[in-house]
A protein has these predicted regions:
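Contiguous, well-folded functional domains in the mature portion of proteins
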Residues: 1-147
Length: 147
């Protein structure tokens, strides 16, 4: 049994406005590969999930594919995003999700990049190269409770 959790969840209540699938490579995303492959996250296949918080602020999630991860599933889209898809492809979306809802999963596992507004900050327990656990708070808007 793998120690990795390959599913990902909504970090907050939000509306999903659009998903852009960007076709690319499937390099490994381990620390060694990150040092060797320049702009690796910009080269690998990825899905740019554009969302809007109730406050009106944008929050973007970018699940990035990796070696052995040739497909990505999103519950709110009735399709599999994978190497057979041509990209970039834009999928308009109008799905509302609640904090903790499962958004999708990787067939094997990978990385998710979070692009948040400037007034968001990491929680104190988030440190470089540390393992993140499902349900662990990652970010918060300055002066508020964690996402």
């Amino acid at each position: 049994m793998s120690s990795m959790y390959h599913r990902f969840h909504a970090p907050h209540d939000f509306k999903i406005e659009q998903v852009t699938f960007v076709h690319g490579d499937v390099w490994n995303v381990n620390p060694i590969a990150l040092k060797r492959v320049e702009r690796l996250f910009c080269k690998n296949e990825r899905a740019v999930i554009q969302t809007r918080l109730a406050s009106g602020e944008a929050l973007t999630l970018v699940p990035v594919a990796a070696i052995l991860v040739a497909s990505l599933r999103l519950h709110f889209l009735d399709l599999t995003l994978n190497a057979q898809s041509c990209g970039p492809t834009v999928f308009p979306c109008d799905a509302s999700v609640r904090k903790g809802d499962e958004l999708g999963w990787f067939e094997h596992g990978s990385t998710i990049i979070v692009l948040a507004p400037d007034d968001f900050e990491f929680c104190d327990n988030v440190v470089e190269n540390a393992r993140i656990n499902a349900g662990q708070p990652l970010m918060r808007k300055a002066g508020t409770n964690p996402l």
